Amino acid sequence: MFSKFTSILQHAVEALAPSLPLQEDFVYHWKAITHYYIETSDDKAPVTDTNIPSHLEQMLVILVQEENEREFGETGPCMEYLLHHKILETLYTLGKADCPPGMKQQVLVFYTKLLGKIRQPLLPHINVHRPVQKLIRLCGEVLATPTENEEIQFLCIVCAKLKQDPYLVNFFLENKFKSLVSQGGPNAISEDVLKSQDSLSTDTGQSCQAEEPLGASGTEHTDLGDQPSHQMGDLSTSLENLSVTALPEATVVRPNQDYNLVNSLLNLTRSPDGRIAVKACEGLMLLVSLPEPAAAKCLTQSTCLCELLTDRLASLYKALPQSVDPLDIETVEAVNWGLDSYSHKEDASAFPGKRALISFLSWFDYCDQLIKEAQKTAAVALAKAVHERFFIGVMEPQLMQTSEMGILTSTALLHRIVRQVTSDILLQEMVFFILGEQREPETLAEISRHPLRHRLIEHCDHISDEISIMTLRMFEHLLQKPNEHILYNLVLRNLEERNYTEYKPVCPEDKDVVENGLIAGAVDLEEDPLFTDISPDNTLSNQEWLSSSPPATPDHPKTDGKTEVHKIVNSFLCLVPDEAKSSYHVEGTGYDTYLRDAHRQFRDYCAICLRWEWPGSPKALERCNLEAAFFEGHFLKVLFDRMGRILDQPYDVNLQVTSVLSRLSLFPHPHIHEYLLDPYVNLASGCRSLFSVIVRVVGDLMVRIQRIQDFTPKLLLVRKRLLGLEPEGPVIDHITLLEGVIVLEEFCKELAAIAFVKYHAASTP
């Protein structure tokens, strides 16, 4: 109470006293602070019970007033006094000792306001950036301290200054050799090492050298202004009596202390106070985005940034429950790293592990955004660290395990982060993790060359339908990502030489349609090696399912584009025979319903693939290596195998398989279009295409239809139940087959719509 009264009385006296020149006023306030340490004997009283806060505030007011009265960039006498007499160094020492209690908080506030309110650049001054560096080291040492808010405010203003003037970062890239081994002096550092550190020198135009030695007592030397020598001695004695003895700086080389600003921010990201943690994350994001190459290099090589980011990601992943419902992982609300606030009591859709899941996804989102904003060198290093320390070190063992529940949970989490990632550089590392970096054509003998890729593709045909569906969904979303390597690794590298085709020089008679409506080189069930197990008596004639069309190959341009697309569309629409169709009995389920979606999706895919510079037409057969053995690749092999069993698989599995195949068909690459959407491609012996696989399914279907009584009415009833037009009733025999037929019909209509849209887009200028 007495100190507060004294403070009020002092303000009143100052208000009534005649105004002094600014410099005299500034020196007065500073000497008032130093006299406190000389005269006081009570080192336990909090700083708020002294006049120190008001004197510091008045010093700031004077400095701001002085700058406003002068030309921009001109240094006034008060600022000169502050710099020349190393006032910031002294304040740092007092703040480090926290004497009187609460002094550290006052020093942090003073530094923050000084850097924030003074417009002229202060950090280039050695008597500013050196104490700022030292004060940075005090931040984040202990979490949940009373000064945590002031610490983050101070660090953020430093980050803002660096963002404003990126060259200033060089003052905060500390030379790791500045702290020498105690028995060695400056000469212990070789000349070569010193030269290599020039770019990271902390002082403008000064060579790297050891920091000033400490006094015998360990107290850092500070200059308190124009104090008489005896008064300085009294002050030193007072500081020692008040325990204001800064601990000696470490005298050993600290390899990860080059960028203390980063280390302090990293510590504060773990603060229990969410607001502090978010501000620390924002500060790191400012630093990684600085364009200075030296800063990026130091950031990733001389700090623990990469390790701490990825280790936290790993620990949050490991904190997840062993089994989480995949639907919960897929449907949990979108997360944002800056809004990671969750209340279990307020959440009506809570589930076990939701808090842990949101924390993991939020931190992954932060890492993703950090890499997205980072300078390229830093971004690559950060992404590689996530790849090596998290993807390979933590996720891969989970994805490779044999427990079905573990596989399902880990695949669902992989699916979620595939959907969530937005950084191109992190996406690239994720793609390399999932698929590997191989780009040469696959061979059947080497499909397990990249174990994780092989395992994930095998999971698309897993005995567990849930695992199959989840893995197929993951690949479906992966295919939608803007990364050329995904499609090339999974499909395109195996179609590059077009060795799925059989090259036949065109004869004049091949251009004519034969009398019965067949075309030259059309697929024949009896001659197709894939149909040797079907009896000729049980197969349909080609006229019943294949519409007539002239040969259409890229080597022989179409004379009538509209006619060509009409015939190709009809080829898909007529694949399923009339007795197996049910859509025309239900209104609004025609082929045209797929056109709008196909147009939108194809437009989106074209926008993604535009920068990949794909050819507009297939590679000429004369330049293709048609002698090489064709293998469609592990991914298409599994999809085609699944497609071939469409009549015997659950409805949900069939929907997912056809969804992935339709996604592949949408890509505007001529080889993909030819292989998946051209019914009239001349397949080489032993090769199959999507069309030939469907043909075989239809052949099998027509044999099985004849064994089922009331097939068409049952089929229509199942369709209406699936659409919700009929209530659920008694179980229908052959329900899996009937649902498979419905999916097959819809898939053929979807392929027809995609073919139409792609041909229309190709013919439009």
From Swiss-Prot:
Cystine bridges: none
Pfam families cross-referenced by the UniProt entry: DUF5917, KELAA, RAI16-like
Chain intervals for the UniProt region annotation (Disordered): 200-234, 538-562
Domain of life from the UniProt record: Eukaryota
Biased composition (Polar residues): 200-209, 538-550
Coiled coil start-end: none
InterPro entries named in the record: FHIP, FHIP_C, FHIP_KELAA_motif
Record's function text: May be required for proper functioning of the nervous system.
Family indicated by similarity: Belongs to the FHIP family.
Protein name: FHF complex subunit HOOK interacting protein 2A
Encoding gene (name): FHIP2A
